[in-house]
Amino acid sequence: MYAVFQSGGKQHRVSEGQVVRLEKLEIATGEKFEFDSVLMVVNGEDVKIGAPVVAGAKVVAEVVAQGRGDKVKIVKFRRRKHSRKQQGHRQWFTEVKITGIQA
């Protein structure tokens, strides 16, 4: 059984027991919560597709960790001008463990 849900403007395909990295959510570590925007649920041959969401479907998850991703370097370079601009960015993420899928 797996489900596709939407969080942080992205769609994620998950099954029970899976750990997923999402865009930062303001939820404390160890806390349980639910995603209501489930787009599709598949259980063997039974496929439920929402228009746009599946009515009554939920993905239950627990926050495992909060953190920051790897550094991404941004470089702007102008040739022959002795000019260079360098910048870095680390995106915040929330790691969640999927504990249940209800359809």
Swiss-Prot record:
UniProt keyword list: Ribonucleoprotein, Ribosomal protein, RNA-binding, rRNA-binding
SUPFAM superfamilies: L21p-like
GO molecular function: rRNA binding; structural constituent of ribosome
UniProt-listed GO biological process terms: translation
GO cellular component: cytoplasm; ribonucleoprotein complex; ribosome
InterPro entries: bL21-like, bL21-like_sf, Ribosomal_bL21, Ribosomal_bL21_CS
One Pfam assignment: Ribosomal_L21p
Subunit-level organization: Part of the 50S ribosomal subunit. Contacts protein L20.
NCBIfam families membership: L21
Functional description taken from the UniProt entry: This protein binds to 23S rRNA in the presence of protein L20.
Annotated family: Belongs to the bacterial ribosomal protein bL21 family.
Name listed for the protein in its UniProt record: Large ribosomal subunit protein bL21
UniProt organism field: Actinobacillus pleuropneumoniae serotype 7 (strain AP76)
Gene, per the UniProt record: rplU
